[in-house]
Amino acid sequence: AFVTYVIALAGVYTATMVPYNAMIGTTTSNPVDRGNLSTSRTLAGFVGAMGVTAAVLPIVNFFGGDKQAWTWMAALFGGISTVLLLILFKNSKERVIESAVAVEKVPLKKNLKALLQNKYWVIMILYMLISFISSGLGGINIFYAQWILGDPAKVAVIGILSFMPIAVGAVFMPVLLSKFSKKTITLIGGIVMMIGLLIIAVFPENFTMIMVGLIIRGLGIAPGAVAAFAMLGDVADYGEWKTGIRSEGLIFSAGTFAEKVGSGVGGLILGVVLGLGGYVSQGATQSTEALFAIKAIFAYLPLAFTAICILLILFYDLDKKLPEIAEDLKAKRVNG
């Protein structure tokens, strides 16, 4: 089972998601269209995740509710995913054609060197890594509901309010992207996130205020969640313009890498901080230090990570250069 899980998640999933995400940059060179594609990706991802979550138990019960039923459930979802990916393959087209120089096979070492010369790639990978580290702290929700709020059942509400506002906020991203740059909406989103987290930090035991804070935080997450992968497409354009090497595969695979590593590091930090706080898993009560550790993971650390992300995005000034880059690349491809 472990081997199957590793092959499925680390192998098949990664091999699928890298080109899937890269298509945001290869299907169009228009920055606004890339934002709209990323919005669709984010919304469909949330709807799909919620749909799968809601359907799991009914499907398992339909197949008998035993151990074998879980296998049939996984096979069913796998089959549906395969069909949808084949439909995507059949109906998608890569419209961003590389110049003759850029399309030549480039050694991996030279590719990596070109990436490191792309300051916007470095900024975005650090931004995504820290964002996913913060997201990886979400496992603290059950601890917070039990030990800070005194009601484990409230974890369901916390979970819903951690994700639903993101989906709602994503709906408005196409309008915002048509009026503002990706940097601007990402910065605004970061500030909104900090406001939500500050509310939670100031009222750590007031469930009403926590719900308000979670809603505000979720609305703030939406711009960055939508814009990040669209920005990677712009980063690929900049890389080709600056170095003559277009490395969409490596650029977007690094985004997937940041997602996996960040989530793992977030989980690791969660365990380490709980341990340092003296959390006792089977204890009837927890020490003041352990309760502080839970609050820190739920609000204080995400607040710090959000501040770092805002600082990183302040150095991202690629949006204003995109018109010039687009014209130069268009001319190069025509003449290449």
Q: Model-predicted segments: where are they?
A:
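Membrane-embedded alpha-helical bundles of multi-pass transporters/translocases
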Residues: 1-336
